[in-house]
């Protein structure tokens, strides 16, 4: 059996894996155990009551967190004309069409989010093998294919998170940084869970949000008692 590191022993002693914690207690635990030499992200895993093998039960979308994610987000926008000027005014770092596509083909990937106006998808479509595996391909469901690219840029800059269930029916995303206040992390988590509940597939049966766990970049997961969250039913 692998020897536990000092950090892992501390986590094991502090976190009861069988318990669901009050959100305030859960965040306090994360903060106490976040001893990395950098400001760790606070991530969330939400187990959904869906059958991910069925396409009509998959959950995908985006929502803006009230307190953002704590990350500086670089945005690339595929568009032209007046939309290009609007995207630049909204704060997009990279704006273009074919010339932007050529940069990406050459390996220049200095951005975190890709947004496209519908007329630009003919160009973006050719980048599927590059953007797709990185989770960067624009999609109408996440608001990244839209005629209003300026609003999409503002949302991305304001702390929009995109979510999509994995093959096990679990949503993984981030809700901030460990140096956020407890209230900020709580409100961000509540906003995410409310968005997920609104995105519940009509064919999904039974309990939809089955389990919520939060963790830091280098830490263990702490289960959250959903009764301590204020979310839409």
Curated annotation (Swiss-Prot):
Annotated Pfam families: Ribosomal_L1
GO annotation terms (biological process): regulation of translation; translation
Keywords from the UniProt entry: Repressor, Ribonucleoprotein, Ribosomal protein, RNA-binding, rRNA-binding, Translation regulation, tRNA-binding
GO cellular component: cytosolic large ribosomal subunit
PROSITE patterns to which the protein is assigned, alphabetical: RIBOSOMAL_L1
Gene3D superfamilies: 3.30.190.20, 3.40.50.790
Alphabetized GO MF terms: rRNA binding; structural constituent of ribosome; tRNA binding
Function per UniProt: Binds directly to 23S rRNA. The L1 stalk is quite mobile in the ribosome, and is involved in E site tRNA release.
Subunit note: Part of the 50S ribosomal subunit.
NCBIfam families: rplA_bact
Family, similarity comment: Belongs to the universal ribosomal protein uL1 family.
Protein name as it appears in the record: Large ribosomal subunit protein uL1
UniProt lineage: Bacteria, Pseudomonadati, Pseudomonadota, Gammaproteobacteria, Alteromonadales
């Amino acid at each position: 059996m692998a020897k536990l590191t000092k950090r892992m022993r501390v986590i094991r002693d502090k976190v009861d894996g069988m318990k669901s914690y009050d959100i305030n207690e859960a965040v306090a635990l994360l903060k106490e155990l976040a001893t990395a030499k950098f400001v760790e992200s606070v991530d969330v895993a939400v187990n959904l009551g869906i059958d991910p093998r069925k396409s009509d039960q998959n959950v995908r979308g985006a929502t803006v967190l009230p307190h953002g994610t704590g990350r500086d987000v670089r945005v690339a926008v595929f568009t032209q004309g007046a939309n290009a000027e609007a995207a630049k005014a909204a704060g997009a770092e990279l704006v273009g069409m074919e010339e932007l596509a050529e940069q990406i083909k050459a390996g220049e990937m200095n951005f975190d989010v890709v947004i496209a106006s519908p007329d630009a998808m003919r160009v973006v479509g050719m980048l599927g093998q590059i953007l797709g595996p990185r989770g960067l391909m624009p999609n109408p469901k996440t608001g990244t294919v839209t005629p209003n690219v300026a609003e999409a840029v503002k949302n991305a800059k304001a702390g929009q998170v995109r979510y999509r269930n994995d093959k096990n029916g679990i949503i993984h995303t981030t809700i901030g940084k460990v140096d956020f206040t407890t209230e900020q992390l709580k409100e961000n988590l509540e906003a995410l869970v409310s968005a997920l509940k609104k995105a519940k597939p009509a064919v999904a049966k039974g309990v939809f949000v089955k389990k919520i766990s939060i963790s830091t970049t280098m830490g263990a997961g702490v289960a959250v008692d959903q009764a301590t969250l204020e979310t839409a039913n």
